[in-house]
Amino acid sequence: MMETLSQRLSVCQDKILEHYETDSTCLSDHIQYWKLIRLECAVFYKAREMGIKTLNHQVVPTQAISKAKAMQAIELQLMLETLNTTEYSTETWTLQETSIELYTTVPQGCFKKHGVTVEVQFDGDKQNTMHYTNWTHIYILEDSICTVVKGLVNYKGIYYVHQGVETYYVTFREEAKKYGKKNIWEVHVGGQVIVCPESVFSSTELSTAEIATQLHAYNTTETHTKACSVGTTETQKTNHKRLRGGTELPYNPTKRVRLSAVDSVDRGVYSTSDCTNKDRCGSCSTTTPIVHLKGDANTLKCLRYRLGKYKALYQDASSTWRWTCTNDKKQIAIVTLTYTTEYQRDKFLTTVKIPNTVTVSKGYMSI
């Protein structure tokens, strides 16, 4: 029985590696990928049930871990199969866009594409900033029907509108409680700054009418227009943004304006950049799994050369580097590897033999 499980695992994992190497953008291929992940989990589950703790030189996860991972694979497979029956099945879909990491990040339970970085500065402190992601395409699947909505940003947070209902998946007031002390913040997005002093609103929520104005990013023209801000009105002639409903705003990338909502979907940035706040990780939705390999510089150079035959198991590899501001006299060298998914990273660590003199550190990075 153990030999049978070993053979099935080898065939399954070979096909998974082929999927990484192919780097397909076809939805049907990704459906097959999640079927393979599901099969792999089933093999591990059965092996553990039989008391087998090592299979094909790999540590067999506990049954609880295999079951949880299999349930995720089943959910992704079913959602992708549903998406494949819609008009959006012919779009380009990458492995990362159909990964469990992106599917479960906010807004959870839906597929997302084309992230735009939203920077929020708390307490007026440039060193206290957090980066969030707004999505230009959010795919909502309900009863075999797929609806695509676009993300919006205002001083309250990041949200989308579906069937007339606003759904906020990031609320800046709650973020300010975690990362600030003065309960004030400002939002930087699409070349605009949304200033949000506490005096603008009370502890009660503003009405829908007060937050309905939306700004189209990067839709400029020239006209005589009125500048719009909270509590002030002025007239000037300049490049401007056109508001929905016919109202227009002056546009200046360096000018601070107080706005109700910003439509930031026109700027195609896929991943967020690093936040200066050390507690940032939970809010940045496009972080990439990484591994730091630490050790002697020559050892790492040789290891990096040998990693060439395992290219399907990681995305990119850095050159050898060191921290400069450190008291470490040994000057430990580092090579950083990035991965498409956590599964790819786990597969790398279980497949590639790392020398005992090299330390492995797992983490996440926004690139």
From Swiss-Prot:
Q: Where is this region: DNA-binding domain?
A: 287-367
* GO MF annotation terms: DNA binding; DNA-binding transcription factor activity; nucleotide binding
Where would I find the Glycyl lysine isopeptide (Lys-Gly) (interchain with G-Cter in SUMO) crosslink on this chain? Answer: 294
Where found in the cell? Answer: Host nucleus
Q: How is it modified after translation?
A: Phosphorylated. Sumoylation plays a regulatory role in E2 transcriptional activity.
From its record, what is one biological process in GO terms? viral DNA genome replication
Major location (coarse): host cell
Q: Which Pfam families match?
A: PPV_E2_C (PF00511), PPV_E2_N (PF00508)
Task: For this UniProt record, give its keywords in alphabetical order, as a comma-separated list.
Answer: Activator, DNA replication, DNA-binding, Early protein, Host nucleus, Isopeptide bond, Phosphoprotein, Repressor, Transcription, Transcription regulation, Ubl conjugation
What are the boundaries of the region Transactivation domain? Answer: 1-201
This protein's GO CC annotations? host cell nucleus
The family annotation for this protein states: Belongs to the papillomaviridae E2 protein family.
> What functional role does this protein have?
Plays a role in the initiation of viral DNA replication. A dimer of E2 interacts with a dimer of E1 in order to improve specificity of E1 DNA binding activity. Once the complex recognizes and binds DNA at specific sites, the E2 dimer is removed from DNA. E2 also regulates viral transcription through binding to the E2RE response element (5'-ACCNNNNNNGGT-3') present in multiple copies in the regulatory regions of the viral genome. Activates or represses transcription depending on E2RE's position with regards to proximal promoter elements including the TATA-box.
Subunit structure, as described in the record: Binds DNA as homodimer. Interacts with protein E1; this interaction greatly increases E1 DNA-binding activity. Interacts with protein L1; this interaction enhances E2-dependent replication and transcription activation. Interacts with protein L2; this interaction inhibits E2 transcriptional activity but not DNA replication function E2. Interacts with protein E7; this interaction inhibits E7 oncogenic activity. Interacts with host TAF1; this interaction modulates E2-dependent transcriptional regulation. Interacts with host BRD4; this interaction mediates E2 transcriptional activation function.
Can you say what this protein is called? Regulatory protein E2
Query: Native species of this protein?
Result: Human papillomavirus 35
